[in-house]
């Protein structure tokens, strides 16, 4: 297992208030024509949100083969619903998981 440390970066237009659930996932995105596969997940609960805030996290990721490509995904929900809806915050581009755990990962999200 590897442990990654990171920060979720909220945008200037992020809502204030509490997020009931923040889900940080690592997904296997190796296959272009297939759904990604969940490899690791960490959840944070009852976290204060504010514009430009940075939210610290840690996630443990199992070792994978060199043929696998992993990517981070973040979903912030104010009401703990797993379905993405208007007002949630998400990563919207690919953030590859580095092979080295030393750098702190920064994951910007946008309001949807």
Predicted features along the sequence, with ranges:
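Short acidic/polar inter-strand loop motif in beta-rich domains
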Residues: 75-90
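Local beta-strand/beta-hairpin segments that build beta-sheet-rich folds
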Residues: 34-41, 86-90
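Short, ordered, surface-exposed loop/turn motifs in non-cytosolic proteins
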Residues: 15-24, 32-33
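A short beta-turn/strand-edge loop motif at beta-sheet boundaries
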Residues: 12-19, 64-67
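Beta-strand signatures of extracellular beta-sandwich domains
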Residues: 23-27, 71-75
């Amino acid at each position: 297992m590897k442990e990654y440390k990171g920060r979720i970066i909220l945008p200037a237009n992020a809502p204030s208030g509490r997020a009931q659930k923040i889900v940080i996932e690592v997904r296997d995105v190796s296959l272009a024509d297939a759904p990604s596969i969940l490899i690791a997940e960490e959840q944070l609960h009852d976290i204060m949100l504010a514009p430009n805030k940075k939210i610290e996290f840690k996630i443990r990721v199992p070792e994978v083969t060199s043929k696998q490509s992993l990517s981070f995904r973040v979903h912030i929900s104010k009401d703990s619903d797993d379905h993405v809806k208007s007002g949630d915050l998400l990563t919207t581009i690919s953030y590859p998981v580095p092979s080295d755990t030393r750098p702190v990962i920064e994951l910007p999200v946008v309001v949807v």
